[in-house]
Amino acid sequence: MQDDNNKNLILASVLSMLVLLTWFYFFPQEDYQPVATNQNAVSDNGIAIAPSASNDIASAPSLTTTVSETREIALEKTKRIEIKSNRIEGSLSLTGARIDDLKLLDYNVKLNDASEKVTLLSPAGGPSAYYILHGFSPAGSLDFNDVPTATTVWSIEDGDILTPSSPVFLKWNNNNGLIFYRKIEIDDDYMFTISRSVENNTNSNISLAPYGLIAQKGPIARAAYGRQESSKNGVYILHEGIVLQTGSSLEEIDYSDMPDEDFSSSERANLKIIDSSNKGWIGFTGKYWMTTLIPDNSAFKAVSKYSENADRYQAEARQETIQILAGQTKEVQSRLFAGAKEYKTIKHYGDKEGVTDFVDSIDWGMFFFITKPMFALLHFLNSMIGNMGWAIIALTLIIKTILFPLAYKSFVSMARMKELQPEMEKLKEKHGDDRQAMQKATMEMYRTKKVNPAAGCLPILLQIPIFFSLYKVIFVTLELRHAPFIGWLKDLSVPDPSSLLNLFGLMPWDAPGPNSFFVILSIGVWPILMGITMWLQQKLNPAPTDKTQAMIFAWMPWVFMFMLGGFASGLVIYWVANNTLTFIQQYTIMRSQGVNPDILGNMFKRFKKEEN
């Protein structure tokens, strides 16, 4: 009977290990680093090509800029209007009215170093160009000389700085009867509102197709492409590339897939065009940051576009052609999100400002039905407690409470099986080596006593999707980035930095990298605690009598310790808390059923055998 208990525990442990090994295969651990702008790099970034309004009109010619050595030089090439709020700073270029300079003031590039903020957008002509352009494509009798393009220099009508309380107004006259106006606003977070109006002073009706595009040069995309390629044998846990909402469904296109789309000779690029309703949006998303075009109240074509010659990746929103009668003025409004993927912020835009399913821009993964409520609960707990580490522990307590009825039945079943140990010994004496008779008698005893020997595996099996979902939450949650816990844990999104090599955090030395020979010695304190708590949990039951089983059982905690040592410390904290609560639950339930676990005896049983 005791062997049955131990077999159940071993089976559960082996299943967990197989799941972890599968996880490592399909979701290899990546040393995820944001793409830093190399201030000394030389680039030949070109300005994005405006789309055509129809197949009958060619796209605007490729417009290139003078090669610049640094981001700062590229910024100085054009006249600018400052952008300033409590959360972002940067500028927009009067050339093309491009939003191409943006830093996120709440986020540092390095932990505890406020001197360098995360740079989201950078100008064309500099390294790692990443910018947003809005405009009109000509239709009918018009051509690109009649509309403002990426190199058009706008004049300032009003406003010399863009803030949440002060919009800016721009103007451009084509000197042929058309005057283009632009009003740009920003809220207190990351949402821009772009209002474009056209005054038709000609004697003819005109047709124009509004568009917005987000353009990135290769370095940003190739960094993500490299991560996707490094895991091409499996499935990378994080989507990076285009994310779009068609109004009815969410679609994703990886950076690595964009060059594989059908080639368009007219646009000299690889294209994928998806029809979207007036509830849709499209943009680029990464692990923590996102830029998104949101055409308001207008159906549009969502476009994924890759230009090999220019090494440029684009996401476009091509709106329906509008007609402006002679003597009339018409306005088109759209929004732009450019900022951090903060759960509370993007949920607000979705719930309160009508951006459909905007919260789904966070990559929830295959267990989204578990991940989403877990994500929401974790953030609620963090808002109440004020610390993500303690919020993870509180979440673990809630999960254990929800699963307690199953755990109770499981542990009661295990306790009752211990009570049947004397009867099992009698059956062994009675049937001897007749395994078939022994098995039949054992199953009859289980049925009579209403004991399920497999019940001990159920709580472990239920934890598998929970483990995957929590890992997903911790991996993609921006709020865990640079979030401290206690002691040496300053960033819950990365592995425990303590190790034997730095005397567990007492010395200011970094742990070796994942490819180092000494990585085996870089197991931190929290992974060690995880191994110890798992080992203690085992000691609630005597070791198996079978030597092979006993050896597997003995090594299991320490194998798990090394396997999970490279995971985010937030996940290891969950595992330690889960092991501790499971130990308390099992010990209490076993005592309530009249079974007194001999923990110390099980710990030192091996040594006693050696003495004898």
Where are each of the predicted segments found?
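Helix-loop-helix
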Residues: M1-G46, L92, R196-S197, A209-Y225, ...
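Intrinsically disordered, low-complexity regulatory regions of eukaryotic regulatory proteins
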Residues: M1-Q2, V42, S54, V67, ...
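Intrinsic low-complexity, intrinsically disordered segments enriched in polar/basic residues
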Residues: N5, F27, N38-N40, S59-T70, ...
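Intrinsic disorder/low-complexity detector
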Residues: I10, N40-V42, G46-I47, I57-A58, ...
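Juxtamembrane extramembrane loops of integral membrane proteins
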Residues: Y25-L121, F607-N612
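General structural signal for secondary-structure boundaries
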Residues: T66-K77, K84, D254, P259-D262, ...
